[in-house]
């Protein structure tokens, strides 16, 4: 599943191309699961609408329209947004095989614009979705009300993070860190990387982690997320950015997918892969000692 840096990379690519585009047609290939709106909604609020902005909240994308409606998209595991223009290609999280004829068998929604360009929402496993809804009602969606603060927002401070994660005192730190109500957009890759950077074992209980360590974890997370965005995200399996390029962050990774390789702090110690709450987890046993 794409995490915050990957979704933000997709957003930036589409934000360069979609604003100003006018919708002329929408074709739904998989309804109602992937696109639950009625034809009447599409006719009234999507046809003829101009794109005004492309936004992100946590791992969710929002394409705002001048009808005061928005297309809200969650890519989930294998969702893809692919923009095809006369002389341009953009998208996010597609397989290389999808850079070809579109629509294909994984296409769930196709949106056509007046200049002949098209936006495809593809999803092989059908976990993702696209929904047309009033812009001012997005914040009332259940998952939007539960999601925590944005880690890269200047208004978000370490104290906010500490207060929220302390609500899970008896939880192991990694699953608490992955809780989207604690901090938005963090997934397995960046949880592993930030915990290594802060020298915290992922199985340590939150109650045994000091406030200073939690502040360090928050600050390390911010630096790692920004580095990943600068590098176009992480190419884990099939992710590419809005220009069709693979993300480069994993070449900077310290632990994720580096099992059996030497730790960058302790070259004599290999990175180990383990399971924490059912999630594959990468650690350095020397850097990250579990506190019980």
Feature-to-residue mapping (PLM):
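Generic detection of long, well-ordered alpha-helical segments
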Residues: 1-4, 151, 155, 210-218
């Amino acid at each position: 599943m794409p995490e915050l840096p990957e979704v933000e990379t997709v957003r930036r690519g589409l934000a360069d191309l979609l604003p100003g585009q006018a919708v002329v047609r929408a074709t739904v290939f998989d309804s109602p699961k992937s696109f639950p709106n009625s034809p009447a909604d599409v006719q009234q609020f999507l046809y003829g609408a101009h794109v005004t902005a492309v936004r992100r909240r946590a791992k969710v994308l929002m394409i705002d329209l001048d009808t005061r409606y928005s297309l809200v998209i969650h890519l989930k595991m294998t969702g893809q947004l692919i923009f095809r223009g006369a002389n341009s290609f953009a998208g996010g999280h597609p397989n290389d095989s999808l850079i070809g004829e579109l629509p294909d068998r994984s296409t769930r929604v196709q949106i056509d614009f007046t200049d002949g360009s098209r936006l495809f929402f593809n999803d092989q496993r059908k976990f993702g979705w696209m929904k047309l809804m009033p812009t001012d009602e997005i914040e009332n969606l259940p998952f939007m009300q539960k999601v925590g603060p944005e880690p890269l927002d200047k208004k978000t401070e370490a104290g906010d993070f500490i207060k929220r994660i302390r609500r899970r005192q008896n939880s192991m730190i990694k699953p608490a860190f992955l809780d989207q109500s604690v901090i938005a957009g963090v997934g397995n890759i960046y949880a592993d990387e930030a915990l290594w950077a802060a020298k915290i074992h992922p199985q340590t209980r939150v109650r045994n982690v000091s406030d200073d360590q939690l502040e360090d974890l928050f600050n390390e997370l911010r630096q790692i997320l920004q580095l990943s965005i600068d590098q176009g995200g992480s190419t884990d399996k099939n992710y590419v950015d809005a220009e069709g390029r693979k993300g480069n962050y994993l070449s900077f990774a310290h632990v994720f997918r580096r099992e059996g390789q030497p730790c960058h702090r302790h070259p004599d110690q290999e990175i180990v892969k383990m399971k924490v709450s059912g999630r594959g987890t990468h650690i350095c046993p020397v850097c990250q000692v579990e506190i019980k």
